[in-house]
Amino acid sequence: VEQICDEAGYTRGAFYSNFESKDELCAAILHDRHDAVIAATRTTADAMPATFTSSSDAADAAVDRYLALQRVDARWPVVSAELRLHALRSQEFRPTYLSWHEEIREQVVQIFSLALEQRGLHLPVPVPQAIDLMEGVSEVASFSAKLRGMPADTETAANLKAMLAALLGVAG
């Protein structure tokens, strides 16, 4: 509990005065993260130009905008891993985590699908699969950078841009 509080930016006192269990703390962290992800995704999609000169330009613009809106604490990759591990270990917390992840995924898929449709863009894979691929790329890049003591944004951005440009380019 102390490590999760510390990594998530909560004090130990805040935990004891606001949460009755580790699961409640974890659910609150997930709720806060949900709102940030959906807001950044929606704002990014709404701000994207109607046309692009290349799939690389489209990917660069989308990823830069999204990451600028997502400026999360550098500790988030560790917090995220801790939350997933807690869900794996805790039968009680697992449904909360799975519900949160599915809800975010569904909303991101809807926003991303609409943005692609409005711009006449298509992917070579279903949008949910593309979202999973980008989530995996982002996670690996974040952890790799973190392990090497580097800021995660640079590597994450480069890898996400490459993945999205490849998906858009193959479909284009």
What spans do the regions from the language model cover?
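Secondary-structure edge/capping motif, primarily at the C-terminal ends of alpha-helices
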Residues: 48, 84-88, 141, 145-149
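Hydrophobic/aromatic-rich alpha-helical bundle segments in the mid-to-C-terminal region
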Residues: 94-98, 116-167, 171-172
